[in-house]
Amino acid sequence: MKITIQHIDLFPTRIWLFDLSGLSEHYPVWQSALDQLRRENPTAAGRSNRNGWNSDKIIAANPLFASLVEAANQAFIHALLQTDPNVNYSFKLELWANIHDQGGYNMFHVHQNVLL
């Protein structure tokens, strides 16, 4: 029996990688802030995190994370311009923290109505 095999690239996926190691000086401050936030709000916000904790979507509003927010905005602008440089995209970041305890993970899920 002869089997003909071919492939069609219908769903190409580009993955952008951004090196944020330049922000590493902020990591200890961010970790302390998130640990404090978890102590103050021990009940996880829910969503897909299992065996751990996640915050509400409040991280972007915290001035301690301003450099991370700026880097994320720049990254999304870069990606969106590669998608189509002739479109003036508008977006708003929602940032939250996921902290996984030993054995923790995120459930498989999708984000409806998102571009990237």
PLM region descriptions:
Residues M1-P85, Y105:
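Non-heme Fe(II)/2-oxoglutarate
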Residues L10, V87-Y89, H109-V114:
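A generic structural micro-feature
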Residues D84-L95:
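A short coil-to-beta-strand element that immediately follows conserved catalytic motifs
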Residues E94-L116:
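Catalytic core of non-heme Fe(II) oxygenases with the double-stranded beta-helix
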